[in-house]
Amino acid sequence: KFDGAIEDYKTALKYEPECALWRDILYGSDKQLFWYCDPYMRACVNMDQGGAIVDLRPYAAKLEWPVGIGTKHVQDASYPFLIQEKYRAGYFTHYAGEGTVRSAKLSYKGEEVDLCLCPTHAHFSQEGKTRILTLDPVTIEFRDLTVKLQTKEYFEEGSSNIKIERNILEMSDPTAEVTLNEYMVACYGTTEYSEDMSHITLKIDGPEEKTINYEYKCREEGVVGAAEVSAVIPEIETRVSMTASDANAEGYVKEGYAFSPMFTLGYRKTISDKEVFATWLNLAKAN
């Protein structure tokens, strides 16, 4: 090394996000996962669930989390999550309420399809400091309408957010309109057991301001033209929010209850053929 015959890996190593698009080859399932990690978050995207975010750690809070004898965390050194499909289940436990996940639903004439039920594959690219996941289009079949939809997910270095873009590529009836519901179900913690949610505040900012102080009453509020929907979680010093590209979209927040304590943030919008709708999931330190 000192003679210059070999390159020291550490001297050339840059501080940049770590990411990996992983495909299962061990069991031959052909499933794909994408992991992204930077100083603001760690996230996992599951292509077998239509590009849903199934793991999210809000590093933006920069928690002090002492571990060991004499601290509040004698053994548990895990950083708290907002979404975790193993400990907080995921889409496939919705029979018991809702598991934690960041996904979207399409509705048409009383029928509803969650993109978690639309397995696909993704391709990775990078433009400047933005890592991009481009998912293969999925076809959603309603009783009398077929919709072809493509998802792109953007991870911009240093932005502390994830942009998710839905593009309606084709409809069997070009004049039809469907309702797109972009949602995030979350519940903080480090284990499968729920933490106390009673100090969480859910809020909608926009033409009308709505606030829910968490009391496990399963309440919901919505505002058309919402600028932002958010949740503040004091215990982990985290503020998580969603914003949308369309100023006319309806933002909503939903409170959980004792046996399904997760909160929900989301946007609903009527969308038509060839239309694109984007939302951002934003993470910040609460104070």
Language-model features: where?
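Beta-strand-rich recognition/accessory modules
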Residues: 16-19, 26-28, 163, 179-185, ...
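C-terminal domain-boundary segment and adjacent tail
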Residues: 1-32
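Short, surface-exposed beta-strand/loop "edge" segments at domain boundaries and coil↔beta transitions
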Residues: 42-44, 62-67, 137-149, 173-177, ...
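Acidic-aromatic substrate-binding/catalytic surfaces of carbohydrate-active enzymes
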Residues: 42-141
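Short acidic-hydrophobic surface loop/beta-edge motif
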Residues: 34-38, 202, 218, 229-231
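Broad, structure-driven detector of short, well-ordered beta-strand segments within folded domains
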Residues: 40-47, 147-155, 227-246
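Extended recognition/assembly regions associated with phosphoester-bond processing machinery
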Residues: 27, 39-40
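Acidic (Asp/Glu-rich), glycine- and aromatic
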Residues: 55-59, 138-152, 157-206
